[in-house]
Amino acid sequence: MATTTSITTTYAGEFAGKYISAALLAGNTIANGGLTIRPNVKFKEVVKRLELDGIVKDGSCDFADTSTLTLTERILQPKELQVNLELCKKDFRSDWDAIQMGYSAFDNLPSSFQEYLIGYVAGKVAQKNEQNIWAGAVAEGSFDGFSTLLAADAGKIAVTGTAVDASNVVVELGKVIDAIPPALYGREDLHVYVPQNVFKAYKRHLATVGGSVQGNNQDINIESFDGVKIFMANGLPSDKMIATTKDNLHFGTGLLSDSQEVRVLDMADLDGSQNVRVIMRFTAGVQYGVAADIVTYGIA
């Protein structure tokens, strides 16, 4: 009698956390520390920002409470999302066998076939989550990203955008830097978040002018522009830029929530097929703290 291999597996709540984490936190922006992560938001969380002015006064014998305290609040409410996929085992079996036999270039070997499938799906979710963070809009399978949220907020510092290439990238980046409030300029966690096309344009410009005394055949590491760190955000749409501090941008999810679930369901025992259903349920969303501390480029 032939041996039947079933790979039906369920992870729920806290036990699903490591798989959900791999799916949501592996994108370019989060993996490289571009945002403040709030990992245990069960429903909603208040993002608070405290500002003080007039805090230092002339000395006197009296207590003079004359400074102004401003507390800004915005609501971070991650959206419930899910993945429902049906995959055919035979489409992955050759790759899986190669990994098990050591013929693959991957360093981290999955301990089981279900983890291999979950890892495959998690990679796709991470890519989609990166896009949602910067350009998402409330629709099927998405949440409002920073571009959408900021476009609706008149309190931001808006710079008119244009098509960016190697010939104008320095001028356009300079417009963003010039618009940054003096109180933010020089802060360690201040970044200009740029899309791939702006990053490549700046790198090409540096190559043409011999940046860092390097030629066209040498790699040029881009770290800053006019003293402000450059962060390439893969999910940011072309010709858009955002300048602010890391602590002003928040990503929320609920890694320990009971509503999180990862399930791999082998359909062989149910309908005789070679199909495997992969199910993920999770929450994700973004929010910023103070719009006045954000410079946008090309985001109306």
Give the location of each predicted region:
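Sequence/fold signature of self-assembling virion shell proteins
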Residues: A2-K57, L149-G161, S167, K203-A300
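Long, hydrophobic/aromatic-enriched structural stretches that serve as scaffold segments
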Residues: I55-E115
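Helix N-cap / beta->alpha transition motif
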Residues: C88, F92-D95, V194-V198, T244-T245, ...
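Short helix/loop capping segments that flank catalytic or ligand/cofactor-binding pockets
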Residues: D95-W96, E130, A201-K203
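Alpha-helical scaffold segments that mediate packing/assembly in large oligomeric complexes
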Residues: A98-A179, T296-A300
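Short coil/turn segments at secondary-structure boundaries
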Residues: I133-V138, E188-P195, G215-D219
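Ordered core of a single globular domain
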Residues: G174-L206
